[in-house]
């Protein structure tokens, strides 16, 4: 599977869990009262940032921790209603 495809697939799952909650981590974190849910997601992004920094410094689990950070970054984008194409368009804009 191409890298863009897997990101789109993960994004779609996150959107589905936001719109049709099931008993999952992502559904639960997004279904709290609005401010509390946002705070929880942002706390996870901050936590994962720290873990990426430590992993890079210690040369341990950098890929694993980076995927956690990317996942939680995608989660806040979905929560905020950002469309996946906006992200790819911004990457394309910066490429030139």
Curated annotation (Swiss-Prot):
PANTHER family: HISTIDINE BIOSYNTHESIS BIFUNCTIONAL PROTEIN, HISTIDINE BIOSYNTHESIS BIFUNCTIONAL PROTEIN HIS7. The keyword Hydrolase applies. Pathway: Amino-acid biosynthesis; L-histidine biosynthesis; L-histidine from 5-phospho-alpha-D-ribose 1-diphosphate: step 2/9. This is Phosphoribosyl-ATP pyrophosphatase. It comes from the Archaea. Keywords: Amino-acid biosynthesis, ATP-binding, Cytoplasm, Histidine biosynthesis, Hydrolase, Nucleotide-binding. The keyword GTP-binding does not apply. Its EC number is 3.6.1.31. CDD domains: NTP-PPase_HisIE_like. GO terms for molecular function: ATP binding; phosphoribosyl-ATP diphosphatase activity. Belongs to the PRA-PH family. One of its GO terms (cellular component) is cytoplasm. The lineage of its organism: Archaea, Methanobacteriati, Methanobacteriota, Methanomada group, Methanobacteria. It catalyses: 1-(5-phospho-beta-D-ribosyl)-ATP + H2O = 1-(5-phospho-beta-D-ribosyl)-5'-AMP + diphosphate + H(+). InterPro entries: HisE, PRib-ATP_PPHydrolase-like.
